[in-house]
Structure formats: structure tokens, C-alpha cells
UniProtKB/Swiss-Prot annotation:
SUPFAM superfamilies in the record: Glyceraldehyde-3-phosphate dehydrogenase-like, C-terminal domain, NAD(P)-binding Rossmann-fold domains
Pathway connected to this protein: Amino-acid biosynthesis; L-arginine biosynthesis; N(2)-acetyl-L-ornithine from L-glutamate: step 3/4
The organism of origin for this protein: Corynebacterium kroppenstedtii (strain DSM 44385 / JCM 11950 / CIP 105744 / CCUG 35717)
Chain's gene name: argC
Subcellular location: Cytoplasm
PROSITE patterns xrefs: ARGC
Cellular component GO terms, alphabetical: cytoplasm
Protein name: N-acetyl-gamma-glutamyl-phosphate reductase
Amino acid sequence: MTVSVAVAGATGYAGSEILRLLLSHPQYRAGAMTIGALTGASHAGQSVEALMPHLVELHGRTIEKTEPARLAEHDIVFLALPHGHSAKIAQSLPDETLIIDCGADFRLADKEQWEAFYDSPYAGSWPYGIPEMPGHRKKIASTRRIAVPGCFPTGATLAVLPALTSKLITPEISIVSVTGVSGAGKKPSVGMLGSETMGSARAYKAGGKHRHTPEIIQNLQEACDEPVQVSFTPVLAPMQRGILTTASAPASDELVALTEKDPSAAQDAVKAAYRSFYSDEKFVVVLNGDQQPATQSVLGSNAVHIQAEYDVAARRVVVTSAIDNLVKGTAGAAIQCMNLAQGWPEDSGLSINGVAP
């Protein structure tokens, strides 16, 4: 059986990255998948080669208007739209259609949190698309509605989750994520001009103001039986893509007790917890020794590179993760979820190998 795929918001960074990955997917290469409607509200009628010249195999195609009736003709629909747009379209699509939403509309389970951070009506929540979180892989495989996580929550969640689950830290977590400019999307703004970003790094929406903060807390709360406190600070850096996250938290009483007996054993325990937690995960690479994650190493891949350290003097666990914000942070996660929901190998069309330099 051949399945048809549509991408709404195809001309944005996330949408075009989904298309790039679909073009190398084994199902597409074997003729078992077709790429149908490519839609974009502001680019309808324009050619793919004019807007996305890098997608050579789609040259000759034209961007269509985003219309639910057209999307409903497909078996799988990726929604790569700004928040507030996906919910309206999703309610018009058939129940049997696999809908994978790359926006924020269905990520938060708490209505009050949604209303506090977003300026559109609450639409409910769907199964959440980080397969590496305990229990989520099964939920993703048994649904036709999937909420792809935000890019910052992906890097932060995967960095902190093992430490919380293994009770290595107290749930008072400081997270700083350095991101490339593609995370802001294609919409022009003064702050994203080259002259504003080149040679400069700056924090923004600090102090709990960023919309991904409640999503990070929601994810980490699943692994903790007491309230999780998160201070999240995003930092814009002069690079095109990638997110480097550093999370730190006070050591738990158990880890402190071990430290007082044998500091070296405490450090080993932290690293061992991460290796054990991710031992069966294809896309999570826990680095050896003192090697640290770098955004360049994951460029173009669906991999997450992680290093966990224990600062004995400060009694803090410090974890760093690196992802490509457009792959594991968005499009790759969407493809990974599609594979699970369709019963295909989870890594189909996805690489753990980055591009360097």
C-alpha cells in the first residue's frame, strides 16, 4: 500500500527540512510513499525551485494554499505552522489521518499554562513526541495525533531526565540553551538581521518568560514525585542552526553522601546513570571521558550528544546536550514519530551522523 504525505507550511525552515528528510526516506525511495500537497499561506502559486532550490527532486512543483479539504486527501499530514493555526486545521481532518503537528498547539496538558504563555485558545493535548521519554514510544505508536516537542524542551529534557529519574539531583534546575538564528523561523525581523546577530550573542526572554518553559517543566515533572523548579534562559548565538544546552542542579542527599565517602565513585555514578538510561536509544550518544557536545557534531543529524559531569566542589550535576534544532529539534523528531506510528523502523530516513566542518 502506498501512503501519501502532505506538508502544510512547507516553505518554512521546519517544513522544508521535513521534505528534505522525506526525500531520503526508504519508503519514498521504494515508491511506497508519495509526497503530495505542499502548502504555504504566503507563497501559494510560487515554485519550489524559487523558494527551496536545495530540494532539487521537488523542482517543478508549486506551493498550494493551505486548505483542509486538500490536506484531507492524504494519509499523513505534517503541520509546520505557527502556533494557533494547527488546531483549526486538525479538527477538519479525518480521524484516520496521521497528523503530526510541529507547532505548539497540542503540547501542553495544562490549560492554564497554555493561556499564560500563548495568545490563542487552548485546543487540548496530544501524545507527546519524544520517544526517548519513558512510556512515550508506546503512546506514539498507537495514535494518529502527535505533538512534536519544541526544540528547547527536547535538548533540555534529554539532558536532565536521567539525573531526575536516578535521583541524582534535587529538582531545582538551571538551564541555559544557546541557539542558532533558524530557531526564530523565516519571518523577517530587525533582531534577526545579519548586522544584529553576527559577532554577538544575547539572552532573551529570561526569567521564566520563554514559552518553552512550561513544556520543559511538564516533561521533567513526569520523572519526579515533587514539584520541579526550572529557571530557563535562551541565548541567541551567531550560527545558523543548533542548540547547545547546559543544565545544572544541586546534588541529591544520596549523591552528596556518596561524595563524602568517595568523590570519584560519585562522579562515576553520574556518568553510569546516563549510559544506563540511554543504552538502548539509537539517537542519544552519551560521550566518553571528558569530551563535550558541540553543535557542529550533530549538524544535519537526528542525534543528541550528551555529557554528564559532577562538580564535586560545588555539589552540582552539570549536563550538556547538543542537537540540531531543525532535525532532532523539529523535523527529525516528526519523522521519527511518523515511523513509530506507521510501524516502520524508528530510524528510517534519519541519520545519527552529523556534517563537519
